[in-house]
Amino acid sequence: MTETLETPVKIVPRLKTKYAETIKKSLQDEFSYANVNQVPRLVKVVVNMGVGDAAKDSKLIDGAVRDLTLITGQKPQVTKARKSIAQFKLREGMPIGAHATLRGDRMWEFVDRLVSLALPRIRDFRGLNGKQFDGNGNYTFGLTEQVMFHEIDQDSIDRVRGMDITVVTTAKTDDEGRALLKALGFPFKTEN
């Protein structure tokens, strides 16, 4: 009796497919790039959760690590204080936050969930500020609570934590980065 082993089919994230099939071509036409490799693309997404109160209570960092693990799908790295600051009762090496760097398919799936599920769940959401680019096509924005992600059970959170999300692109200018993120579905506020 012989058995055939089936290799698991690799599922490509839908936003990555959309980028490859439609967005790449439209950006190349819009900015008239000579080479397809000049078209801006996503490099990585960094999700950072600062827990300043962890200086007083070190157990708070565990909740941030747990939340970030659920949101990003990978174990975050704990950020430790580089310098001691007496006014904040902070010592060098104390845990003060956590961050996770997403690349590849995890990054595409996170951006898809962020744009299509998490951002629409924010109360009184009017769109992201389009002026928070760094001058090199990278975009950073903050979220005030972690409850908007459907992976987080609203009854099990110990406290509300905000987070910073940085989207790093290969765009050379802010306009190119904004066009890429808008094509990926980021809801920017309309300029009045």
Swiss-Prot record:
Report whether RNA-binding shows up as a keyword of the record: yes
Q: Does the keyword Nucleus apply?
A: no
Q: Which GO terms describe its biological process?
A: translation
Per the record, the domain of life is: Bacteria
Q: Which GO terms describe its molecular function?
A: rRNA binding; structural constituent of ribosome; tRNA binding
InterPro entries in alphabetical order: Ribosomal_uL5, Ribosomal_uL5_bac-type, Ribosomal_uL5_C, Ribosomal_uL5_dom_sf, Ribosomal_uL5_N
Q: Which Gene3D superfamilies match?
A: 3.30.1440.10
What cellular component terms from Gene Ontology apply here?
A: ribonucleoprotein complex; ribosome
Annotated keywords: Ribonucleoprotein, Ribosomal protein, RNA-binding, rRNA-binding, tRNA-binding
Q: Which family does it belong to?
A: Belongs to the universal ribosomal protein uL5 family.
HAMAP family (UniProt xref): Ribosomal_uL5_B
Functional summary from the UniProt entry: This is one of the proteins that bind and probably mediate the attachment of the 5S RNA into the large ribosomal subunit, where it forms part of the central protuberance. In the 70S ribosome it contacts protein S13 of the 30S subunit (bridge B1b), connecting the 2 subunits; this bridge is implicated in subunit movement. Contacts the P site tRNA; the 5S rRNA and some of its associated proteins might help stabilize positioning of ribosome-bound tRNAs.
Q: How does it assemble?
A: Part of the 50S ribosomal subunit; part of the 5S rRNA/L5/L18/L25 subcomplex. Contacts the 5S rRNA and the P site tRNA. Forms a bridge to the 30S subunit in the 70S ribosome.
Name of the protein in question: Large ribosomal subunit protein uL5
The gene is rplE
